[in-house]
């Protein structure tokens, strides 16, 4: 059989048994070489088993400019014209071979040469094609610009032939074809070839549901090397209208390419063309567009686009990734209730939670929007759908949500469940949650549970965990527990980081422990970390605490060099420095020099203006803050309301207006939650100044109205825990009304908060494995914390002659470990005298003020009794002259009555009683004699 006969036989078989090997639609014409091409055909395929991948073509030399390709060549029967069929008319293969167009010659030559190998599988056939290209380039390097078109046409024909015979191949095999085409410099032809691949050949390639397409990296390379991809994509939709699915894949991939690169304007244009012109709205494309808008912080536009899309394709509302985006919008933006409502509606319509991620994000959103009542029902719904598939992350999200709500009962319950049902491998992350919620961190019981489990399960901790623990205990001012946990982690080999040293220094500054401050300052200097950002900020705070201007100037220089992001903090410290120095006008001057003041700066300025009684300036400051778009926080609300309350009746009206404007129900959850205000005392403190002012003015009706507003808020918002200032203000209100029952309720509330927050932590039982708990007591920093509250309540009890209850409550506080200051001790003596208990009053004077130990503390160098008496009669005496005068008056009355009632109601003659005082406590006797 001759060679020509074999070719004719193959041609006839091919022509009548397969689809025609032409492009179904015309391609654009590429300029041909002016000179003719010659090939040495005998050099081709000397080795039929040649390996592919031998083409070495520089891609930058063969880039094409799509904008130069403007017209599709019209069909012509003139074989000398390098045009392609635009109808069913076809140009025979022999005419291509005899064409004067070099591009057609290369294509005809390759097709003529490789037709016999169409029966091979894809990879062997690709090897033949690559070998052919290599030999052709060796024979004539000038044809490299014609090879991509020929390569594309050849594989288009091959794919059509194979598809008609139910041949399938994998995406990995097809990707090798496209990579070779890219190496030849045919990025545009990659997209042409993809648009022509029969769907049956590899269904995976036309899946628009995922952005992670098998050819994604290849498409990215093409989009980078094509000068105008949008024009080419439009052209493909015209050339291959039947390849609608493939074209949608290309559009979606280009959309992903644009959004990843940040070309949002082009992305919007392309999506609009997909959505309006071609009516494509795949889940992936919609998600890409919403994501791109979210990255630009265009939350309202993203929500608007979502609404338009689901109006056309309601099923998109159930897509878990788009749902997650909506919940993300609702949690990160200042206020996006629309996004949250849409997400909730979609979840409600589907009657199920679609994924773990959506559930976790949903927990955060519920906390933010103060819908804590929905948390547990949704947890039950999740439980029903996933059948107890509680992963560590899910348990973490549930406990986090409850932590942000301050719901201690359910926190403990779900944490215990996590121990049984799941290995809570991310247990240490909960410590960070507790740090963000002072409701939980001040209670500290759950912190101890976590530390116990960290030790029991031998979970590895890091420097960040140490910093969190130090911060939690320093916030409670429990220095013993803080030092104990620091030592415990250090013994485990955890290094004390710069942030940890800063946290320790912060704690000792707060506790005013001069000795420990100097100790850690020495360590910091020896380590050479004084210019660390976190350390420098604590040194600023130390300078503020000591009113050390030189140290503050040194810190300022360091901050200007190394802490550009800390300029706001520096301005805050400088303003507070001037405020403490009573240089209020200088503080305002610093504020006016800040280019973009934050809410803290506004709060300090409001406090200063309130102290200066400048109501007009305070109103202007409020307007400026609104005009700059600064949303009020809990701190700014307290600052403005308190400052307004100091301006008399007119200021009180402004305070009421300001609070009613900013304390709307839909704003409360944004203002008062553990994320926006670490100190949960802000919500009640907001009401404290108002209740106090209305009560002092005698406007009981308004005071009750403010109190009822808070109680309504408190009953619906478990994130807010009453603090002591609020309870004192409320108790003072009911004391003024002589309401014993409600006054007692608020007093009990004060003690409840105190027992929760002011009692020492039994840290030794955790780190030392002690089964016997250590005796608890009041944290030293809080020993005198209840003096103001006690004075208010005890004065009320004395005014209504409830001396028995006063004695009980006084003893109750002493048993808890709280201490009374000298002022309260003097009042206690007066109350005893009111109750006609002279003997008890005299004994208290001796035990509290005139014991040898107290005299030694007060007058270390006392040389005689006269000097002691002189001190106690001076203005510096802790025993007030008014107290001594009341004692002397009571004794004079006893002299007139001729007897004194002592313990157990026994009556003693006054003369004998005075002799006893002179014998047992001569100093007191002589002191009273001189009054």
UniProtKB/Swiss-Prot annotation:
Q: Disulfide connectivity? A: none
Q: How does a null allele present?
A: Impairs growth on galactose. Decreases the association of cox1, but not cob1, mRNA with the mitochondrial small ribosomal subunit.
Q: What lineage does UniProt assign to this protein's organism?
A: Eukaryota, Fungi, Dikarya, Ascomycota, Taphrinomycotina
Stretches forming PPR repeats: 247-277, 282-316, 429-461, 462-496, 497-531, 598-632, 683-713
What keyword terms does UniProt attach to this protein?
Answer: Activator, Mitochondrion, Protein biosynthesis, Repeat, RNA-binding, Transit peptide, Translation regulation
Q: Which GO terms describe its biological process?
A: mitochondrial gene expression; mitochondrial translation; mitochondrial translational initiation; positive regulation of mitochondrial translational initiation
Subcellular locations according to the entry: Mitochondrion
One GO cellular component term? cytoplasm
Write down what this protein is called.
Mitochondrial cox1 translation regulator ppr4
Its domain of life reads Eukaryota
Please name one Pfam family that this protein belongs to: PPR
Function of the protein:
RNA-binding translation activation factor that as part of the MRH5C complex specifically recruits cox1 mRNA to the mitochondrial ribosome for translation initiation.
Q: In Gene Ontology terms, what is one molecular function of this protein? A: mRNA 5'-UTR binding
Query: Which residues does the Swiss-Prot or TrEMBL entry list as transit peptide?
Result: 1-16
Q: Output the InterPro entries linked to this UniProt entry.
A: Pentatricopeptide_rpt (IPR002885), TPR-like_helical_dom_sf (IPR011990)
**Self-association state and partner proteins as the record states:** Component of the MRH5C complex, composed of mrh5, ppr4, mtf2, and sls1. Proteins mtf2 and sls1 form a subcomplex that serves as a scaffold to bring mrh5 and ppr4 together. The MRH5C complex associates with the small subunit of the mitochondrial ribosome.
């Amino acid at each position: 059989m001759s060679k020509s006969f074999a070719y004719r036989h193959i041609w006839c078989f091919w022509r009548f048994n397969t689809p025609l090997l032409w492009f179904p639609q015309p391609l654009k014409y590429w300029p041909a070489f002016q000179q003719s091409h010659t090939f040495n055909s005998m050099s081709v395929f000397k080795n039929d088993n040649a390996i592919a991948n031998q083409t070495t073509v520089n891609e930058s030399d063969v880039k094409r400019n799509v904008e130069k390709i403007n017209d599709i060549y019209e069909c012509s029967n003139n074989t000398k014209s390098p045009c392609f069929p635009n109808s069913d008319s076809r140009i025979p293969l022999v005419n291509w071979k005899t064409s004067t167009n070099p591009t057609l010659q290369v294509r005809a030559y390759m097709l003529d040469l490789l037709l016999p190998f169409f029966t091979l599988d894809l990879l062997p056939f690709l090897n033949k094609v690559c070998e052919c290209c290599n030999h052709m380039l060796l024979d004539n390097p000038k044809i490299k610009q014609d090879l991509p078109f020929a390569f594309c046409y050849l594989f288009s024909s091959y794919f059509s032939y194979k598809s008609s015979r139910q041949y399938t191949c994998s995406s990995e095999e097809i990707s090798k074809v496209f990579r070779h085409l890219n190496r030849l410099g045919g990025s545009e032809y990659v997209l042409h070839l993809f648009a022509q691949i029969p769907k049956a050949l590899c269904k995976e390639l036309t899946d628009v549901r995922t952005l992670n397409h098998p050819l994604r990296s290849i498409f990215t390379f093409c989009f980078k090397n094509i000068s105008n991809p949008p024009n080419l994509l439009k052209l493909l939709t015209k050339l291959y209208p039947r390849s609608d699915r493939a074209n949608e894949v290309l559009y979606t991939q280009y959309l992903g390419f644009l959004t990843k690169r940040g070309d949002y304007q082009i992305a919007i244009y392309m999506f609009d063309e997909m959505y309006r012109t071609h009516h494509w709205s795949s889940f992936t494309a919609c998600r890409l567009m919403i994501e791109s808008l979210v990255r630009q912080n265009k939350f309202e536009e993203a929500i608007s686009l979502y609404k338009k899309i689901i109006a056309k394709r309601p099923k998109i509302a159930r897509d878990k990734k788009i749902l997650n985006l909506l919940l993300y919008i609702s949690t990160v933006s200042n206020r996006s209730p629309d996004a949250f409502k849409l997400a909730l509606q979609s979840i409600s319509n589907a009657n199920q939670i679609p994924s773990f991620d959506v559930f976790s994000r949903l927990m955060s959103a519920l906390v933010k929007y103060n819908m804590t009542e929905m948390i547990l029902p949704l947890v039950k719904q999740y439980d029903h759908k996933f059948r107890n598939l509680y992963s560590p992350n899910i348990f973490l999200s549930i406990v986090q949500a409850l932590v942000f709500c301050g719901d201690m009962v359910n926190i403990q319950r779900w944490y215990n469940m996590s121990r049984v049902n799941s290995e809570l491998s991310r247990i240490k992350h909960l410590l960070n949650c507790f740090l963000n919620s002072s409701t939980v961190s001040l209670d500290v019981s759950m912190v101890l549970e976590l530390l116990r489990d960290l030790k029991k399960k031998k979970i590895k901790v890091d420097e960040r965990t140490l910093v969190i623990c130090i911060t939690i205990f320093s916030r409670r001012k429990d220095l013993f527990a803080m030092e104990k946990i620091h030592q415990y982690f250090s013994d485990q080999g955890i290094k004390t980081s710069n942030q940890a040293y800063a946290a320790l220094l912060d704690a000792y500054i707060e506790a005013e422990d001069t000795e420990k401050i100097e100790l850690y300052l020495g360590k910091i200097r020896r380590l050479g970390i004084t210019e660390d950002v976190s350390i420098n900020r604590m040194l600023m705070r130390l300078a503020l605490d000591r009113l050390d201007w030189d140290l503050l100037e040194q810190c300022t220089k360091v901050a200007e060099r190394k802490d550009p992001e800390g300029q706001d903090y520096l301005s805050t410290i400088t303003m507070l420095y001037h405020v403490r120095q009573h240089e209020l006008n200088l503080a305002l001057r610093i504020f006016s020099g800040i280019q973009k003041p934050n809410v803290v700066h506004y709060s300090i300025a409001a406090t200063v203006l309130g102290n200066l009684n400048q109501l007009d300036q305070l109103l202007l400051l409020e307007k400026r803050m609104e005009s700059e778009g600064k949303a009020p926080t809990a701190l700014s609300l307290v600052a403005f309301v308190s400052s307004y309350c100091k301006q008399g009746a007119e200021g009180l009206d402004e305070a009421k207006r300001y609070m009613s404007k900013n304390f709307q129900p839909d704003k409360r959850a944004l203002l008062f939650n553990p994320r926006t205000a670490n100190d949960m005392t802000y919500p009640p403190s907001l009401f404290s100044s108002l209740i106090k002012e209305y009560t002092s003015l005698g406007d009981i009706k308004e005071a009750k109205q403010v109190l009822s507003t808070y109680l309504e808020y408190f009953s619906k918002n478990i994130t807010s825990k009453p603090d002591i200032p609020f309870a004192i203000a409320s108790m003072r209100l009911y004391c003024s009304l002589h309401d014993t029952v409600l006054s007692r309720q608020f007093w009990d509330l004060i003690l409840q908060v105190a027992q929760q927050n002011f009692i020492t932590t039994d840290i030794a039982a955790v780190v030392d494995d002690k089964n016997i708990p250590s005796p608890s007591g009041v944290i030293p920093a809080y020993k005198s914390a209840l003096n103001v509250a006690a004075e208010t309540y005890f004065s009320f009890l004395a005014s209504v002659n409830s001396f028995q209850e006063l004695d009980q409550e006084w003893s109750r506080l002493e048993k808890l470990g709280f201490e009374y200051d000298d002022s309260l001790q003097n009042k206690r003596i007066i109350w005893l005298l009111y109750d006609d208990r002279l003997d008890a009053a005299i004994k208290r004077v001796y035990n509290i003020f005139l014991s040898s130990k107290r005299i030694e503390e007060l007058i270390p160098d006392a040389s005689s009794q006269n000097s002691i008496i002189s001190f106690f009669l001076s203005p510096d005496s802790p025993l007030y002259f008014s107290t001594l005068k009341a004692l002397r008056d009571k004794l004079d009355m006893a002299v007139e009555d001729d007897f004194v009632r002592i313990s157990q109601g026994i009556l003693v003659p006054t003369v004998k009683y005075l002799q006893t005082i002179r014998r047992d406590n001569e100093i007191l006797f002589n002191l009273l004699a001189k009054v």
